[in-house]
């Protein structure tokens, strides 16, 4: 627990010990993914309540499931996404309840805490709250650069101090992959699509006037198109 990302490791190892029981692993993994996707949806609907796009909230978790099909990916990555969605939901709630000073204070506390307990997913969180504030046009949204800069400083100090061997471990997904595995672009899709989905929910406000069946078509076409473009060449184990 004293190591960076130690809580994610502790939780994942605690859960994995029960996976030898039939169906437990699948059920626990599905439950974690379901909760994470639901929490992300609660944040997305604050951007715009586009119910027909709700399935997209689970797209980042879908990629996490694909990563877990590879022996080189750690279960900590899925646990980290759960806490990312939880922290993002907490922040989005506070952004509406408090003024920009308290919002920035919360934003400065959550990324380092997430970094220490869950690892490099904190950089995704810092980018997510910045994008959320921009899309919501929050009061003094530019103050959200402060948590990002703070995390960049903390992460850099960890690398310079020897706590982490490389910047990929603090600012990218290498923290959740075996050290001897080359980090493929495929591993970044989960984080990238999370930010993309936030942007799509913002843009969906311009589609409110179209018919319901066209909205449903959009909800189906977007994830299918994305997976078709990215998966075929990236699923080799």
What are these regions (language model features)?
Residues 96-111, 142-145:
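Short hydrophobic alpha-helices at membrane interfaces in multi-pass membrane enzymes
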Residues 227-233:
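Conserved small/polar residues in nucleotide/adenosyl-binding loops
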Residues 1-18, 63-73, 155-188:
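Membrane-interfacial interhelical loops
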Residues 181-220:
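Cytosolic-side transmembrane helix boundary signature
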Residues 19-34:
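Loop-to-helix entry region of an early transmembrane alpha helix in multi-pass inner-membrane enzymes
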Residues 2-5, 29, 52-98, 116-122, ...:
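Membrane-interface micro-motifs in multi-pass membrane enzymes
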Residues 125-144:
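Perimembrane helix-loop-helix junctions
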Residues 30-47, 85-90:
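Transmembrane-helix motifs of polytopic, lipid-linked glycan transferases
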């Amino acid at each position: 627990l004293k190591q960076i990302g130690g809580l994610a490791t502790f939780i994942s190892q605690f859960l994995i010990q029960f996976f030898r029981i039939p169906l437990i692993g699948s059920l626990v993994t599905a439950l974690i993914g379901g909760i994470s996707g639901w929490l992300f949806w609660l944040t997305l609907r604050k951007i715009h309540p586009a119910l027909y796009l709700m399935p997209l909230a689970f797209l980042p978790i879908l990629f996490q499931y694909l990563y877990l099909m590879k022996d080189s990916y750690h279960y900590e990555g899925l646990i980290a996404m759960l806490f990312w969605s939880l922290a993002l939901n907490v922040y989005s709630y506070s952004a509406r309840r408090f003024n920009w000073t308290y919002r920035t204070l919360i934003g400065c506390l959550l990324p380092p805490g997430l970094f220490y307990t869950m690892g490099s997913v904190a950089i995704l969180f810092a980018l997510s709250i910045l994008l959320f504030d921009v899309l919501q046009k929050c009061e003094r949204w530019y103050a959200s650069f402060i948590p990002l800069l703070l995390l960049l400083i903390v992460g850099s100090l960890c690398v310079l101090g020897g706590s982490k061997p490389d910047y990929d471990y603090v600012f990218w997904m290498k923290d959740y992959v075996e050290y001897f595995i080359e980090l493929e672009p495929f591993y970044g899709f989960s984080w990238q699509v999370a930010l993309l989905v936030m942007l799509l929910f913002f843009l969906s406000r311009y589609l409110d006037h179209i018919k319901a069946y066209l909205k449903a078509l959009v909800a189906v076409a977007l994830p299918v198109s994305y997976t078709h473009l990215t998966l075929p060449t990236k699923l080799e184990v």
